[in-house]
Amino acid sequence: VVDGDQRIALATTGALVVDMESADLAAAAAGGPFAVVRVVVDTPGAPLLRPGTPVRGLTALRTLRRAAPALRTWLDATGPRTVRLAEPRSFCAGVERAIEIVDRALDRYGAPVYVRRQIVHNAHVVRRLTDRGAVFVQEVDEVPPGAHVVLAAHGVSPAVRADADARGLSVVDATCPLVAKVHTEVRRHARRGESVLLIGHSDHEEVEGTVGEAPARVTVVEDEESARTVEVPDPTRVAYAMQTTLAVDEAERIAAILRERFPSIAAPRQDDICYATTNRQRAIRAVSADVDLVIVVGSPNSSNSRRLAEVAARQGVPAHLVDDVSELDLSWLAGVGRVGLSAGASAPDDLVDEVVSCLSGLGPVTVTATSTGSEHVRFTLPKEVSH
């Protein structure tokens, strides 16, 4: 029991003082989460029978009323639950390769190493590499002449490469090999004089780079309505390609419309949507069939992470995308006994561990895994950092 300067000191630190009565309440909670809010208006140094006591009591009641809604939200979120982890999840081979390229470039050349755009779409990855000495820029004209620059995993247009060469930059290309494959397809069709319909989102960096391979030949098709209305100069000389991080079912619906409208359209030699995107969507679809809530860990600018949340939502399950555990909303967990959890291909898996740890703080958690396959893909590194 404290008063005076001691009370003020505790108040400023937000300390929680547990007395013997509160300890009895803790025992009654049987090891589960609990909170105790106590108001002390009587201490040896400040007896109850004095003029200021009613004021202190009324102030305490107002404080309790303000705290009550938050405590109710917290209470509703507590309880035992099962967490179903989607497998595979988190980093794909292309993301691992891109991050390793920046790490190796820093080891070999020393800081600063410049990176055009985010190496992958995840704020935590970018922050860690920044702490190591990577400098992220929007365009290569921000890089000092002669410096080392890494091109991000999403790929770039030939114009960006030309700008880098003109500045005498030492370029290390971290473009995902599966994205590079789409670039190769687009160039091949353009050289044949064919129109290319690129299924994807026009504001995504991957699409910007792919379009840049043949701007006069490529038209972006963003949705089913665009697929129904897009026109090409010669319907008999047309091909289509896909952004690698799309929702599989949505992309196929768009492609089906294009195949119906243009019977002679050339399809990709192999599905452009990458194996990791497909695998993670299949896993979250399986998880969504048996949970009350889905949480996807990933940054909001990550296309594949957003698609995971959308796939879960289309299964009729509430789904939320969070950058990390700090964005969890307790109100989502009210009455929820089964939580599905995944992470986008650019999100570190330790962020998933932090979410599980947070849920464990709200009650006993049983963790299970729902696996729809395993991944053993490994891409080689560019020669600039491979030795």
Where do the protein language model's features map onto the residues?
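Glycine-rich phosphate- or other oxyanion-binding loops that anchor nucleotides, phosphorylated ligands
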Residues: 1-77
